[in-house]
Amino acid sequence: MVKKNTFFANKNLGQNFLVDSEVINRIINVINPKSHDFMIEIGPGLGALTYPICKILHKLFVIEHDNNLGTRLLKDISNIEVFVEDVLKFNFLNLINNSFKSVRIIGNLPYNISIPILFYLFKFHNNIIDMNFMFQKEVASKLLAIPGTKSYSRLSIIAQYYCDIDFLFDVVAQSFYPIPKVTSSFVRLVPRKVFNLYVRDINQLSNVTALAFQQRRKIVKNSLSSLFNDDALRKLGIDPLLRAENLSVKQYCLLSNHVC
């Protein structure tokens, strides 16, 4: 197990530190970092992944909101660059453009902001090779959900539009300190280089899905009544009596293009 030292988790930052060496080794194996990889780690915490990865890479970039943790890593590791910043305000393009390479991103994401982080990273999808993240299992289920299931959500649609997504494995709560109340899942997201669905304006896809899932059990003729009448829905091949959770990613793309 990784030593917890004298650091205490900051609940406001959603910190749950990975401390299980078996899980850490498994993550390193599935990420399979190469010495030349341009890699960014979000939320390194106590350095459970940071230390072993830095033994492989020429250099690792990390984004850590907690100044104490960031300073500790900088003191201990020579081939690391630490940005003590809020990841939701971090300009990834500056770093990417300066390196002239596409990036791999890894992290044990803070549970309380994992979804906002993901939506923020989608903005940089053209410059990302893959993202390997630890999520709360409930979030992982939403990422992978198919239409008609309880977990299917706006997150499912946006994430599946942008990425190919693979579930890698679950991680029990006892692998973290402090022990969370939930199981976690390690997931890989690979941004598409060629989109298999056409979306004219991603903002419209975001707006349509947000509107539809405000009340997911409503039929779409009601939840989307401000945008579409029955005839418009039928012309797009969509049954007005279906609920938001029953429409496919492709159908949401059609709806968003019709609004543009």
From Swiss-Prot:
Belongs to the class I-like SAM-binding methyltransferase superfamily. rRNA adenine N(6)-methyltransferase family. RsmA subfamily. Pfam families: RrnaAD (PF00398). NCBIfam families: ksgA. Its EC number is 2.1.1.182. It comes from Buchnera aphidicola subsp. Baizongia pistaciae (strain Bp). SUPFAM superfamilies: S-adenosyl-L-methionine-dependent methyltransferases (SSF53335). This is Ribosomal RNA small subunit methyltransferase A. Specifically dimethylates two adjacent adenosines (A1518 and A1519) in the loop of a conserved hairpin near the 3'-end of 16S rRNA in the 30S particle. May play a critical role in biogenesis of 30S subunits. It catalyses: adenosine(1518)/adenosine(1519) in 16S rRNA + 4 S-adenosyl-L-methionine = N(6)-dimethyladenosine(1518)/N(6)-dimethyladenosine(1519) in 16S rRNA + 4 S-adenosyl-L-homocysteine + 4 H(+).
